[in-house]
């Protein structure tokens, strides 16, 4: 699962790599989180364009967004078959700009965040799917999700999943809506080994409000502590004549 990532390099670096004509001047972002605006590159009228969409895919057929769970990742194994992804995989594939992402590794009773980036410091592209949802009053909401796959050898010790990284020489294939989805799906695979490096960073990244360069600095302190849990409240004694409530089945959810 990929739930946080970063876009920190100069806008011109991304423009040269992705080949879109617009010249956006976006600030560095060190802690991009679900529901926030994210930059994607897609095909429109035969050319590439950069666009801002919400991170969290919302299929066009959803009637009420409140009834649809937030989908930030699309498992590569199911994009050809799952109703939430099928249509986007056919016609609305995109590239998601990035130069690093975070994964959390179990460390004792806690989890230690790690920052993952290319060893050469270059930007890269997540494989993405985008959708446009239209509300009852004609309002439009464009959204996207990151396609994921099993982790490669280098990243598997941290997390079992990783984003699909599209090689630069395959950008055109992934973006072209005239390329059938099964051919495009051939790009859904773990990144080559020795491409990325990973190192521990501060747990400050856990807080979405934090967004600064210190988040990607190497952290050599002790392992992350376990999350603090509030002490359970002492239940009031029930009257002796009160019968215990019947099981309503909710325990099976946890």
Where in this protein do the model-derived segments appear?
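Short linear sequence motif anchored by a di-proline
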Residues: 1-254
């Amino acid at each position: 699962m990929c739930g946080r990532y970063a876009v920190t390099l100069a806008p011109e670096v991304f423009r040269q790599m992705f080949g879109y004509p617009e010249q956006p001047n976006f600030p560095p972002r060190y802690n991009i989180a679900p529901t926030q605006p994210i930059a994607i590159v897609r095909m429109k009228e035969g050319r590439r364009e950069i666009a801002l969409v919400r991170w969290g895919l919302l299929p066009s057929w959803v009637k009420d967004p409140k009834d649809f769970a937030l989908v930030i990742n699309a498992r590569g194994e199911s994009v050809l078959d799952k109703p939430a992804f099928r249509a986007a995989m056919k016609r609305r594939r995109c590239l998601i700009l990035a130069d690093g992402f975070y994964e959390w590794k179990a460390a004792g009773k806690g989890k230690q965040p790690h920052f993952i980036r290319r060893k050469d410091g270059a930007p890269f592209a997540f494989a993405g799917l985008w959708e446009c949802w239209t509300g009852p009053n004609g309002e439009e909401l464009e959204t996207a999700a990151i396609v994921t796959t099993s982790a490669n050898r280098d990243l598997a010790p941290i997390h079992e999943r990783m984003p699909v990284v599209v090689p630069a020489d395959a950008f055109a294939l992934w973006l072209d809506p005239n390329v059938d989805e099964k051919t495009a799906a051939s790009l859904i695979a773990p990144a080559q080994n020795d491409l990325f490096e990973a190192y521990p960073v501060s747990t400050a990244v856990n807080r979405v409000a934090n967004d600064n360069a210190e988040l990607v600095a190497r952290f050599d302190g002790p392992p992350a502590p376990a999350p603090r849990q509030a002490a359970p409240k002492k239940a009031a004694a029930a009257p002796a004549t009160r019968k215990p409530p019947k099981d309503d089945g909710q325990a099976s959810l946890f």
